[in-house]
Swiss-Prot record:
Name of the gene encoding the protein in the UniProt record: grpE
Subunit details: Homodimer.
Matching SUPFAM superfamilies: Coiled-coil domain of nucleotide exchange factor GrpE (SSF58014), Head domain of nucleotide exchange factor GrpE (SSF51064)
Region (Disordered): 1-28
Keyword Acyltransferase among UniProt keywords: no
Lineage: superkingdom: Bacteria
The protein, known as: Protein GrpE
Assigned keywords, A-Z: Chaperone, Cytoplasm, Stress response
Keyword Chaperone found: yes
Species: Sulfurimonas denitrificans (strain ATCC 33889 / DSM 1251) (Thiomicrospira denitrificans (strain ATCC 33889 / DSM 1251))
Amino acid sequence: MSQEKKEELQSEAQVTKEETPQANEAAAEAEAIVNEFDLLQEELNSLKDKYARVHADFENIKKRLEREKYSAVEYANEKFAKDMIPVMDALHMALSSSSSIIDSAEHLEKLKEGIELTLKQLSTALEKHGITMVSHDAPFDPNIHNAIQSVDSDTVESGQIVQTFQTGYKYKDRPLREAMVVVAN
């Protein structure tokens, strides 16, 4: 071998020795990147799985709340209905007891008494659920009273209710039915 060839081989060997640590570093760095990529991929898959589970839980909760809301609306008047049952019982008892009473004066008095008690029971049940009668002692209010007539009156101030033809009712603050009244001029 010639001197030139020896020098060339030595320089190649030296270059290879110099490149080998760099190649090893590059390979190690590439392996580290691949490992980090694998870890990140696993974490991504785990997070996707968690997201899918949370989303499914959310949808289930949403459906359950919708069913509960529907049920609550469907049975919202259950307490009210239960409070009306005793009133119905009282009316049935009044009808059934009227056939056993022989004396007509006594019959009318007992029937009147039964109707008054039933009316009181009904008023109490309605008030318990926020349904009240519109006041007739207060000044005329177009939100809860319907003036069907106005009359001149010396005994009642102008704007006051003179007579009530039909009782009005409110549910809490909302009118259910306006009272039909006569108002003083």
